[in-house]
């Protein structure tokens, strides 16, 4: 299955795109072999410029903000990838806190966080959003443009651990989606 992002572009595929799609098994194998030798970050994104005859990476982000661009049919693949990544870092994971950025100028960023949360929930994890922002002193509901809501809670320091809900939600993993 090839990931398809939502886009306004239509029409026939360019020659380069046809070649890339034809080489998908070879490309996927190369990534698989590299990931056996090198542990990749939990997640990242790469902005790619397509000149029609060559592709070039122009930016790499350790805290990706484009999960809201995934087509609905991509959620099974995204969930499978998330499960594999979680398994590497914490095989018995049950609880995860995602720490989003709260002051993004991108109006779609929080929809991205909602989709990332959905992917993590589909893996079977209990997912909550936490913040170190001094303005978040109690669970705070944020309305999104698409009608969804997110609840962000203040992170609490309990010794060397970060928890939520007066220590009742103790994650085995904290996932930053925030440049801090």
Q: Each PLM stretch: what is its role?
A:
Residues 1-180:
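Preference for protein termini
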């Amino acid at each position: 299955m090839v990931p398809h992002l939502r886009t306004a572009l239509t029409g026939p595929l360019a020659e380069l795109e046809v070649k890339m799609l034809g080489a998908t098994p070879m490309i996927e194998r190369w990534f698989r072999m590299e990931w056996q030798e090198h542990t990749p970050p939990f997640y990242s994104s790469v902005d790619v410029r397509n000149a029609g005859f060559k592709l070039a990476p122009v930016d790499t982000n350790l805290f990706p903000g484009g999960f809201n661009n995934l087509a609905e049919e991509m959620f099974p693949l995204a969930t499978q990838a998330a499960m594999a990544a979680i398994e590497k870092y914490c095989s018995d994971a049950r609880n995860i806190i995602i720490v989003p950025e709260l002051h993004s100028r991108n109006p779609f960023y929080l929809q991205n966080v909602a989709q990332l949360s959905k992917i993590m929930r589909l893996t079977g994890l209990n997912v909550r959003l936490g913040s170190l922002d001094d303005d978040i002193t109690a669970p705070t509901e944020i309305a999104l443009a698409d009608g969804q809501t997110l609840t962000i809670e203040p992170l609490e320091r309990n010794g060397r651990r970060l928890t939520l809900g007066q220590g009742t939600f103790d994650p085995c993993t904290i996932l930053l989606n925030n440049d801090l």
